[in-house]
């Protein structure tokens, strides 16, 4: 019995995403085309591969068994295709990245625009999200986060310069409530608190390994919303210097406790496994590495 390999590719996409619509987005097909492909495969195999309801799709026992048995072979085929892609004069494919919103805004977008100019046959899909998502489960090639929150079992590469966090508020706030002179003084101020999507609040870290659990009436899980709240005078924020530079230059915000602020490792791009690295990710890492080498050479003393 001859099988259509594209139907198996559709089967794997639906199994990974547990959704016809998400599988269609991944493969560039409509939900009806996905449904037709799965129905055709089930008819040829004479087994039901998925349990379907109006709200969910899940593998049957037979479907789960087929998925687990065939997945190593399909992974190997994908690796071989990616390796063949390396022989092309111009690599092709899709690069899917999940990044923190602030990273996309302050440096990642310029990197990706330059990358797509150099590799016009690679399509880039960027999703911005301040939560620490499971990039493998969500189908991303890589993620971009601050190094301090990248999971230890991931392979990571520095993608940006060191970052500096600034304690900042509006001049009006400081005129009304005074300026903190020591990090412990922040406990007597209204602070705009950033909270991770997990619910854990971000503690403000300073020199001399000092960490302050600030408090305030406004708790947010979005760094852009945090900045807006600080600009509206809601309290003191702890924000990336690159994020607020324009507001410092125009006087809308002021920094305090600068002697306590320290540089820390910046953003990293991370991914799960070198063996299964997509052609797009491999090309992007090479592009980033080449740019870093050129930058270091420009700043090397003559």
Swiss-Prot record:
Entry-linked InterPro entries: LysR_subst-bd, Tscrpt_reg_HTH_LysR, WH-like_DNA-bd_sf, WH_DNA-bd_sf
Gene: ycaN
Keywords: DNA-binding, Transcription, Transcription regulation
Record-level GO BP terms: DNA-templated transcription
Identification of the protein by name: Uncharacterized HTH-type transcriptional regulator YcaN
Keyword Amino-acid biosynthesis: no
Originating species: Escherichia coli (strain K12)
Gene Ontology molecular function: DNA-binding transcription factor activity; sequence-specific DNA binding
Record feature DNA-binding region, as residue ranges: 20-40
Domain (HTH lysR-type) ranges: 1-60
Superkingdom assignment: Bacteria
UniProt similarity note: Belongs to the LysR transcriptional regulatory family.
Matches recorded under SUPFAM superfamilies: Periplasmic binding protein-like II, Winged helix' DNA-binding domain
PROSITE patterns listed in its UniProt record: HTH_LYSR
